């Protein structure tokens, strides 16, 4: 099969297997030469392990000094004779291959992270591969929906997340990657049902359920930590993000971290929400109004030499903040701030200046659109110089592989 990029709006409909491997390899190469993680965790569970921060965390902990064994949970689309499947499928496959070559355990579990069945599979895997205990649980789920538990069965049977403002409509620009155009959009405010749905899918509810399940199964090691990822951003992004449905869910996540921290104190451990920097991920390109900010931010931070991708963020999180130090640096709300370089005052002044001038005719010049789009393409295995995209790919090498 000849695999070409297929983009509809901001969604990639194809993925290149060997390009995805290249993305994994580049992240492995980065962490091997970076400041190493000291006194890191040895047995790690990653819920949402196939892309973005979850995948980067898995790579950093395996290859960046901690030499961790990992169990990764994700929900990805497998390839067929006619379809390439999703990038996350190949990320999982190639991560496992390279981790095992390095002598590490890498277990991939495919399925619905919200389900009771997956909790049972994970506990069984912890018993089998980790002698019954984990040292770190990473919660990195970006999902559009969550099946309601049996106890709350109602119509409809799913909670659905909606990226919308709360209270009043918000206007902003979205970049359509399929034809490189700037589209002005207005988002109507969320209904109460949409606010509740987003809170249930993207908030701390399921994270807490997972930790409770693992405590009850006696699967937490002494000193066990758990983290989940959040974003806050500057004022310019607040109407659509922090003040909207996503922000409501993230604040719930922060509150959950405090409740879980009390529970993990019994294990001499801790729970933390990690506020990351704004990045191009499969999830972030969906957020209307965020793309122009990302373009300006990328341009300014690259000019200053402070730009980080997911892998740089995760390596710095584990080596500089979470492990190897007597105290974990927290802000006044007990959050770990990995957006510290993004929120640098001078950086934000320069970003705001660019944003005020940015429009449909100049966004490619004022912002780092080339870098933004290249990063998006590389999430799906495209635009790597090392890959010959004219070569046909034999999909039989990947169908039914685990």
Curated annotation (Swiss-Prot):
UniProt: substrate binding residues: 231
The protein's Enzyme Commission number: 1.3.1.9
Q: Which residues bind NAD(+)?
A: 48-53, 75-76, 112-113, 141-142, 250, 279-281
- Tell me the route in metabolism or biology where this protein functions: Lipid metabolism; fatty acid biosynthesis
Family matches, as Pfam families? Eno-Rase_FAD_bd (PF07055), Eno-Rase_NADH_b (PF12242), Enoyl_reductase (PF12241)
How would you summarize the oligomeric state and partners of this protein?
Answer: Monomer.
What protein is this chain from?
A: Enoyl-[acyl-carrier-protein] reductase [NADH] 2
Species in which this protein is naturally found: Vibrio cholerae serotype O1 (strain ATCC 39315 / El Tor Inaba N16961)
């Amino acid at each position: 099969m000849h695999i070409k990029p297929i983009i509809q709006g901001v969604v990639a409909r194809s993925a290149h297997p060997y390009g995805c491997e290249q993305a994994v390899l580049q992240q492995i190469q980065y962490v091997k030469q970076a400041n190493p993680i000291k006194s890191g965790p040895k047995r790690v569970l990653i819920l949402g392990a196939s892309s973005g921060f979850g995948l980067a965390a898995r790579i950093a902990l395996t290859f960046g000094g901690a030499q961790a064994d990992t169990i990764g949970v994700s929900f990805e689309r497998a390839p067929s004779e006619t379809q390439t499947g999703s990038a996350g499928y190949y990320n999982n496959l190639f991560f496992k291959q390279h981790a095992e070559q390095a002598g590490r355990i890498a277990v991939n579990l495919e399925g619905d992270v919200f389900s009771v069945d997956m909790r049972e599979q994970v506990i069984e895997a912890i018993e089998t591969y980790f002698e019954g205990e984990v040292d770190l649980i990473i919660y990195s789920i970006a999902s559009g929906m969550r099946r309601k538990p049996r106890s709350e069965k109602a119509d409809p049977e799913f909670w659905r997340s909606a990226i919308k403002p709360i209270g009043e409509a918000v206007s902003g620009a979205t970049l359509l990657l399929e034809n490189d155009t700037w589209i002005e959009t207005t988002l109507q405010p969320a209904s109460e049902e949409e606010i509740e749905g987003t809170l249930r899918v993207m908030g701390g509810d399921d994270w807490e359920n997972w930790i409770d399940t693992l405590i009850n199964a006696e699967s937490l090691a002494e000193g066990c930590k758990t983290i989940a990822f959040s974003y806050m951003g500057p004022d310019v992004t607040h109407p659509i993000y922090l003040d909207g449905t996503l922000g409501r869910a993230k604040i719930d996540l922060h509150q959950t971290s405090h409740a879980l921290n009390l529970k993990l104190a019994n294990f001499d451990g801790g729970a933390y929400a990690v506020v990351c920097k704004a990045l191009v991920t499969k999830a972030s390109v969906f957020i209307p109004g965020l793309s122009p900010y990302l373009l300006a931010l990328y341009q300014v931070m690259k000019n200053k030499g402070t730009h980080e991708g997911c892998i740089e963020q995760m390596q710095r999180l584990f080596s500089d903040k979470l492990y190897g130090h007597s105290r974990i640096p927290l802000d006044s709300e007990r959050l770990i701030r990995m957006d510290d370089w993004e929120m640098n005052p001078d950086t934000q002044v320069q970003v705001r200046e660019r944003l005020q001038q940015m429009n449909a005719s100049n966004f490619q010049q004022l912002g780092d659109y080339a870098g933004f789009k290249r990063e998006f393409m590389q999430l799906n295995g495209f635009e790597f110089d090392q890959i010959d995209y004219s070569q046909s790919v034999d999909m039989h090498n990947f169908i039914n592989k685990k």
